Each structure stands twice: as C-alpha cells, then as structure tokens.
C-alpha cells in the first residue's frame, strides 16, 4: 500500500524489513527514481536495514551524557549576546546562548516574549480584516489616540482625540463621537472621575483643585489600556507564502497566549508563543514539550548549528516535562532533585548539600555515574554494567 | 472556550483501559508509577481521565511516523 510506483515484489521485499515508515518511503523513492530490479531492491533494502539496526542506540549507552556533549559543544560556538532581528521583521528576539539558557532554565517569562498569530481564512487573506484583529491585540493607550494637555488655570486634563486614528483603530465603528464616548467611559471607570465630552474633546479634573492630583491623573491616564491586550506593545503584520497562496501572519511583541486564542479571527490551531509556561498553561505538557523542542532547535538553527540531532533536544524536553510540569535543568530543577547526595554535591553548592545530607542522615546508594566516579568504582554503563563469572563445571 | 485538542501542538490523548495497560507494563517490565506523569489539571487531558488513570499519547514523531507514549495522571 505505498504511494510509490513500484512492483508488488519490490514492495513485499521492502515491507519485510524492520525499517520505520519514513525510511521505507525513502527507500521506495530511491528505487523508483533509479528503476532497479527486484534483486537489487532486495539488496538495497537489506543494506539499509543493516545500517539502520547498527545505528540504533545500544543497551547501556549513556544517552544523556552524549546529549549533553552534543548540545554543549555547539553551544560554545554560539554568540554570547545577540539582540535585534530574528528572521521576523522588526521584532527584537533574544537569540543564541542567552535564549538557550533561558529555555533550559525554564524561566517564567522570556526576555523578549513574542507570539506568532495565525488568522482564520477570511481574515488571513484580507488586509483590512487582518488589521481588525491587530487592533484587538495591540494595546492602545491614550498617547496613541490624541494629545493630552493640562490646563492648570482650570485644573483640567484635556484630551484632543485624533479622528483618523480613532477610525483606524475602531474599524467596526463609523462614528467618532461614539468612540470618544466609549473612551470617556473607560476613563471614568478607571480613574473614578467624571468627564465632559464634546465631539472628540474630553476633559476632566481632580475633585479638589490640587496640582499634585492633576499630575497624578495624567500619569494614571497614560497607563489605561483602551483596546487590545495589556501585555502586547506592538504587532507586526506580514504577508507570508503558504502551500496554497498567501496569508497574513501577525507577530507580536509581548505575549498573552490565553487571551489571544479567544479573539475572533485568530486561528487557535496554529497560533504559537515563545513562552513555554504560557503554552503549558493553555495547552498542557505535551504541547509544552513540542514547543521546547521547536524553540531549542530554532535557536540552534538560527546560529547555523542545525547539525545537532533533534533526538538530543527531544531527550532534554522529555526530562524537563517528565513530572507533568516544566522543570528546569540545574540546581533548582532536575539536577537538584537527584536521589544521590554526591551527585548533587558534585553539581553546585557542594558544601550545602553535604551539610544538609549529614544533618538528615542521608544514604547514598552509589547507583549513578557521578557517585561512582567520586568513589573510584566502575560506572554502571556500557561494559561497566556487565559482570563476567567463571563457570564452576568443566567440559 | 478554545478547543485545546484542535491545536497543532497537542497530540491525541486517550485513556488506556486496564487490559491494555497491563500489556504495556509487562512489555516494558515497569510499574505504573515509573511512567512519566501528567497533571490532572492538564488542559489536554480527556474529560473522563481521573487520577491513577494512564493516558496514551500518540505524537506525530520527528524521527518516525508516530510515537506512542504513556503518562500517568497525578494530582
């Protein structure tokens, strides 16, 4: 049952091997391309199978150590500090080593949170409609809407709203007065003052004439979010090629994954975020694991280190999500929760671990690698875990 | 409310029944508690999953077609 144009005999030969689906497909396409006969096909399939079985990890192979080395070595070639630009237009994204450290440390919030927001079909193809979503996401504060001036003589804050901006940011409302009214209401409920609104002019002042209160009001006014999501400071809209045509994709500076998924027009099946904790909260551990792998792989690729095998990154992500939550590698996470005192002491803050272990009377079973290296015994990996015994009978 | 299971990043989760679970545990010679865990509050869990259940997760694997893993539901 293959999509490739090969004879039934060849198919039987290839299907007979222990290869995984993906490799079988590759074998098929090579056979099809070269037009080889059944005998040759059999030999090819057997050779590929032998090679595949050879490259599988042996029992007792120290996969963790190999992963650590395989990520660590390319890590030394990474840039210590890169800001600016990450393939995505005009958006600052932390990259290189700082980003990698951030990921394995499982920081609560990344240095530069961002989201990639995909849109539902009707929004994704129409620039106007895509902009509707942009204004639902990007936080709109008063400075973007008009000019604020303080009238000290009458103790008033005066806002002169810009009509064009209003119409642009509220694309579904056509009446600037109605929008200004909405803004005035938001101000009233947030600052607890009464406002006077006429056309696009809004003015209000403190209850008692006080210069300090007046300035305080202006400060607070600047913080109010009139539209959009508070955390998101900027949205960039980009046209991207897809398999079937073009679509608009939004990139955001700042992230609030949960809020964005609920917005109308947002495709909740493809939208992603670079904060693994937000993904975990909204989509669960498995999605967080996927994101961890994607993000670490992208970080390495961005630095031209794409020859690191994904399997290493998958192992790291597996360990980090093993307990059903996201744990960091390191003293406060995986390495700090090891059973062995000696292994923990060998990692960081040696004295504290030894002291605590002594106080609590901990016992070290000497099961792991580090402990055995410390006490000078063979480690239980590879040939170290195999015991040979001489037979008692002679024959 | 957004349907979490529709997201590309979320693989298929399903509760494993007793017999299947027994087969899996004997195959790998492990106890149920040796499995990786998943929190009861996890968004991707099926509604009928309870603490102590094991869920089967069928991932779209990067290295083969699909990878089947199991997680034990914990508090």
Swiss-Prot record, chain A:
Keywords (A to Z) from UniProt: Cytoplasm, DNA-binding, DNA-directed RNA polymerase, Nucleotidyltransferase, Transcription, Transferase
GO molecular function, one term: DNA binding
InterPro entries: DNA-dir_RpoC_beta_prime, RNA_pol_Rpb1_5, RPO1C
Catalytic activity entry: RNA(n) + a ribonucleoside 5'-triphosphate = RNA(n+1) + diphosphate
Gene3D superfamilies according to UniProt: 1.10.150.390
GO BP field: DNA-templated transcription
Protein's recorded name: DNA-directed RNA polymerase subunit Rpo1C
Native species: Haloarcula marismortui (strain ATCC 43049 / DSM 3752 / JCM 8966 / VKM B-1809)
């Amino acid at each position: 049952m293959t999509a490739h144009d090969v004879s039934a005999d060849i198919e039987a030969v290839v299907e007979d091997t222990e290869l995984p689906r993906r490799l079988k497909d590759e074998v098929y396409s090579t056979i099809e391309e070269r037009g080889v006969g059944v005998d040759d096909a059999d030999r090819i399939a057997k050779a590929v199978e032998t090679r595949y079985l050879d490259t599988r990890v042996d029992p007792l192979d120290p996969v963790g150590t190999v992963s650590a080395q395989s990520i660590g070595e390319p890590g030394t070639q990474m840039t210590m500090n890169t800001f600016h630009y990450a393939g995505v237009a005009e958006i600052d994204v932390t990259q290189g080593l700082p980003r990698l450290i951030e990921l394995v440390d499982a920081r609560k919030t990344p240095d530069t949170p961002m989201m990639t927001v995909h849109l539902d079909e009707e929004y994704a193809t129409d620039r106007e409609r895509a902009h509707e979503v942009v204004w639902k996401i990007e936080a709109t504060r008063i400075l973007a809407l008009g000019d604020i001036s303080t009238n000290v003589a009458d103790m008033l804050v005066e806002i002169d709203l810009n009509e064009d901006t209003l119409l642009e940011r509220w694309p579904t409302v056509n009446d600037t007065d109605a929008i200004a009214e909405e803004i005035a209401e938001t101000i009233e409920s947030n600052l607890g003052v009464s406002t006077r609104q006429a056309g696009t002019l809004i003015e209000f002042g403190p209850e008692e004439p006080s210069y300090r209160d007046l300035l305080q009001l202006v400060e607070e006014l600047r913080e109010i979010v009139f539209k959009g999501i508070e955390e998101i400071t900027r949205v960039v809209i980009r046209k991207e090629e897809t398999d079937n045509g073009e679509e608009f994709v939004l990139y955001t500076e700042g992230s609030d994954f949960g809020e964005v998924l609920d917005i109308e027009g947002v495709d909740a099946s493809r939208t992603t975020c670079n904060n693994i904790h937000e993904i975990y909260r909204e989509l669960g551990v498995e999605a967080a694991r996927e994101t961890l792998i994607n993000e670490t792989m992208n970080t390495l690729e961005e630095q031209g280190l794409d020859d690191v095998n994904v399997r290493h990154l998958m192992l790291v992500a597996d360990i980090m999500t093993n307990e059903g939550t996201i744990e960091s590698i390191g003293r406060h996470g995986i390495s700090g929760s090891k059973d062995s005192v000696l292994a923990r002491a060998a990692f960081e803050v040696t004295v504290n671990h030894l002291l605590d272990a002594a106080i609590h009377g901990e016992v070290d079973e000497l099961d792991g690698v580090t402990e055995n290296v410390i006490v000078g015994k063979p480690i239980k990996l590879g040939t170290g875990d195999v015991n040979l015994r001489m037979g008692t009978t002679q024959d | 409310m957004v349907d979490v299971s529709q997201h590309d990043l979320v693989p298929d989760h399903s509760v494993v029944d007793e017999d299947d679970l027994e087969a899996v545990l004997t195959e790998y010679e492990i106890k149920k508690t040796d499995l990786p865990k998943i929190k009861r509050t996890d968004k991707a869990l099926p509604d009928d999953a309870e603490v102590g259940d094991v869920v089967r997760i069928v991932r779209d694997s990067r290295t083969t077609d699909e990878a089947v893993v199991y997680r034990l539901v914990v508090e």
